[in-house]
From Swiss-Prot:
Recorded family membership: Belongs to the GatC family.
Taxonomic source organism: Methylibium petroleiphilum (strain ATCC BAA-1232 / LMG 22953 / PM1)
Record lineage: Bacteria, Pseudomonadati, Pseudomonadota, Betaproteobacteria, Burkholderiales
Any coiled-coil regions, as ranges: none
Self-association and partners: Heterotrimer of A, B and C subunits.
Main EC class the enzyme belongs to: ligase
SUPFAM superfamilies per the UniProt record, alphabetical: Glu-tRNAGln amidotransferase C subunit (SSF141000)
Protein's name according to its UniProt entry: Aspartyl/glutamyl-tRNA(Asn/Gln) amidotransferase subunit C
Top-level lineage group: Bacteria
Length: 99
């Protein structure tokens, strides 16, 4: 997946970035380099390879320090929402920012 200068301009616009021509060119090169790496990784056959939860588990035995998933804090949503400018049905209301 190769990006074009138009793609970089669009991404910069969406990210509210003002890039010079030189910066756009450098960004295009960096992004295309990233996507090249992703494509090479996709090409690797990983059939039969178990996923690692940590890279260390490939070279040594790793004991996971798991704990019970238990609630340790009390629900303070209502107290936290008292200072919010707008709340509805327990949700924070924010202004629309998508054009």
């Amino acid at each position: 997946m190769a990006l074009t200068p138009t793609d970089v301009s669009r991404i910069a616009l969406l990210a509210r970035l003002e890039l010079s021509e030189a910066e756009q060119s450098a960004m295009l090169s960096q992004l295309n380099g990233f996507f090249d790496i992703v494509e090479r990784m996709r090409a690797v056959d990983t059939t039969g390879v178990a996923p690692l939860y940590t890279p260390l588990s490939a070279v040594q035995e790793v004991a996971l320090r798991l704990r019970e998933d238990a609630v340790t804090e009390v629900d303070q949503r209502q107290a936290n929402q008292l200072s919010a400018p707008a709340v509805e049905a327990g949700l924070y209301l924010v202004p629309k920012v998508i054009e």
